[in-house]
A protein has these predicted regions:
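Beta-rich carbohydrate-recognition modules and glycan-binding surfaces
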Residues: 23-261
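Sec/Tat signal peptide C-region and signal peptidase I cleavage site
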Residues: 17-23
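Intrinsically disordered, low-complexity segments enriched in polar/charged small residues
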Residues: 7-8, 95
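Bacterial N-terminal signal peptides
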Residues: 8-16
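Positively charged n-region of N-terminal signal peptides that target proteins for export
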Residues: 1-4
Length: 261
């Protein structure tokens, strides 16, 4: 009898301790978002619709030694796709594309170019959702000793350079870049930026490498993120509006704390 009572009591205590643990929501929701597959369909892609981003295009800027008289730099979309992505392409009727860039410089040295998103004729920074842990993309290397970096802007407004490796290989390669934990991705201030943003790609030449004929192609830029990292109980109240206090105070002829700048 006593053993039965002890057993029932133990089960009751176990249930009491486990119930709150089971009921607590997870603080992690790891997802992967494809930012751009460079298929250039002329309409908003899935990420632009999901994140509320603008329908950006891509542009390029270069260092001063670029061969402008030769019409460089050149950028366009081309039919193509890495073999590893072809198996994942469920729409067999589609025509996957990649973004290509061709450069030629007048002399060796510390030459560079940047491929960046653009909207309405101005540079546009793509917002990340959640807290990104890694960014990866496919790049076609021409076996030149060039170096490629990712540029991101943190929630404090500082631009960080994330090295992705060199381009001394032939064909397609998937490059994966870990986002350092010290980069602030969310501002603690209500008036501060709510997310980290993607600024663009930067490619740098080795000072001793040939620079007269270089091609590079990009495909499927994506990132892995914890979408719940900045979500907390009462999150919906963070950006609530209290109304236009300044207009109310001016109409009544009295001042208030809401007028303080």
């Amino acid at each position: 009898m006593k053993k039965g009572v002890v057993l029932l009591t133990s089960l009751a205590l176990l249930a009491a301790f486990c119930a709150p643990v089971v009921a607590q929501p997870s603080s992690r929701a790891v997802e992967t978002f494809i930012v751009d597959d460079f298929d250039n369909k002329g309409e908003k892609n899935a990420y632009q619709q999901m994140s509320g981003s603008e329908q950006w295009t891509w542009n390029i800027q270069t260092s001063r030694n670029i061969n402008k008289d030769g019409g460089f730099p050149k950028m366009d979309y081309f039919d193509g796709q890495p073999n590893s992505l072809k198996a994942l392409n469920k729409d067999k009727e589609s025509s996957p594309k990649v973004l290509g860039v061709k450069t030629s410089y007048l002399r060796k040295g510390e030459n560079w170019f940047e491929v960046y998103p653009e909207f309405d004729g101005k540079a546009y920074e793509i917002p990340f959702v959640g807290t990104a842990t890694q960014i990866d993309f496919w790049v076609w290397g021409a076996n030149y000793l060039y170096y490629i970096d990712l540029l991101v802007r943190d929630a404090d407004g500082r631009v960080h350079t994330l090295p992705a490796g060199n381009l001394a290989f032939n064909g397609w390669r998937n490059l994966v870049v870990t986002v350092p934990g010290h980069i602030r991705q969310h501002s603690r201030l209500r008036s501060g930026p709510t997310e980290m943003t993607f600024v663009g790609f930067r490619v740098r030449t080795d000072p001793d490498e040939y620079v007269d004929d270089f091609n590079i192609f990009f495909d499927q830029l994506k990132y892995t993120t914890n979408t719940l990292s900045n979500i907390f109980d009462g999150y919906e109240l963070k950006d609530i509006e209290f109304g236009d206090s300044s207009s109310k105070s001016s109409s009544s002829g009295s001042s208030s704390a809401g007028d303080a700048k």
